[in-house]
Amino acid sequence: MDDAEKLLRTSAIQEIDNLAKLDVNRESRKGVPEIILGDGKTPEDLAKITLRMLSENGRAIVSRVDMQGIGAIRETAPKDAILEVNDKIGMLVIKKTDFHVKKTGGKIGLLTAGTSDIPVAEEARIVAEEMGCEVISAYDVGVAGIHRLFTHLRNIIEREVNSIVVVAGREGALPAVVAGIVNVPVIAVPTSVGYGLGEKGISALTAMLQACSLGLAVVNIDGGVAAGAIAALIANQVAEAKGASKYQP
């Protein structure tokens, strides 16, 4: 009976008119918080959804939100709410004052091939940190100057990360290089950076899918949120297992 009640609680859905059905207990059920997508929503609807999530969970995370959406949320949010906005990538986190992210002990490495890949990497960073992970990052270390990579990759390895997110556009070569060196899972993120033949991330995605380095998984083009969630799930499972192993005879 207790297990059944727990399942019902963790499956709770909050309906907002005929607008949205919020999976408010997603994080307790599967370890990943619900992330509200700003694309395609009016500023008013987005603010209503975001503030309901804030009310229910103490925190709301919004991705791909424009300045109008940010403005609507800011205008209607409680005055004591903590609002963290990265307007360069359209990412917003709003929290109640008593909400604190529990640190899990999970560690993630985060690399980009170029400066233009940073916005997608920042999506991954924010998601992973909101899932309790520490993120060790190094940007603009791609194969056009491969010597830039090794010092930063050595530091990431020495910090004993549990997974690494590698973000690259154009030919998308960096993830395969990294996966051929390290002994932890690598999540590759192709970006839409690049032009000409194979533009908009097509070459990068194809190259990553064709990579011969094992231990490499690929998300969709510009899929920073997905990559951050996957990397954090891996890292948090490892951290939990390490913690449990301390008490094994």
What are these regions (language model features)?
Residues 82-86, 178-202:
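Short, acidic/small-residue loops that bind anionic groups at enzyme active sites
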Residues 152-191:
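Glycine-rich phosphate-binding loop
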